[in-house]
Amino acid sequence: STGGTDLAAQIIHKYTGLSLGMCVILIDGLIVLTAAFVFDIERALYALIALYVTSKTIDLVQVGLGYSKIALIITNEEEKVRRAILHEIDRGVTRLPAYGGYTEHERPVLMCVVAQSEFTKLKQLVRTIDPTAFVIVANAAEVLGEGFQR
C-alpha cells in the first residue's frame, strides 16, 4: 500500500498521461522530502530509494515485460526479407525510402515491429537471407494499431 496516495496518483495519471509509477514517485516523493525535515536525511534517502523501486515495479507490472521491438533493416535482399517477414513471422513491413550518406545510393529501409517473442526469429531470418544486412533494433514501449496485439 502507498498509504492512500495511490488514488491521487491514479487521478494525476488519468489527466496528465504520466505513467502511474511516475505519479506515485511524484506524490510520495513530496511527502518523503517533507518528512526529511522532521527525520534525518539518511532515512529520507532510504525511503526515496524504496520509492523509486516501487514506482518502477508499478510501471513494469502495468506495462508488462512485453516490450515490442522495432527493427530497421537495410539489406541487398529487400524483397526476400520482406516476404519472409510477411509470410514466416506474419507481421507487416513498411518500406521507407532512404539515401545512403556514405554510399550515395538510394536504398530502401524495411521497418518492422515484432513482439519480443518473435524477435529471435526475425534476426535468424534476416541473417539467413542476407548475412551482410544492417539491422537497427529499438524497444517500443507502446504499439497501437489494428492487428498488432495477439
Curated annotation (Swiss-Prot):
It is found in: Cell membrane. It comes from the Bacteria. InterPro entries: DUF2179, N-reg_PII/ATP_PRibTrfase_C, UPF0750_membrane, YitT. The keyword Coiled coil does not apply. Keywords: Cell membrane, Membrane, Transmembrane, Transmembrane helix. One of its GO terms (cellular component) is plasma membrane. The chain crosses the membrane at residues 19-39. It is a multi-pass membrane protein. To B.subtilis YpjC, YqfU and YitT. This is Uncharacterized protein in cccA 5'region. It comes from Bacillus sp. (strain PS3).
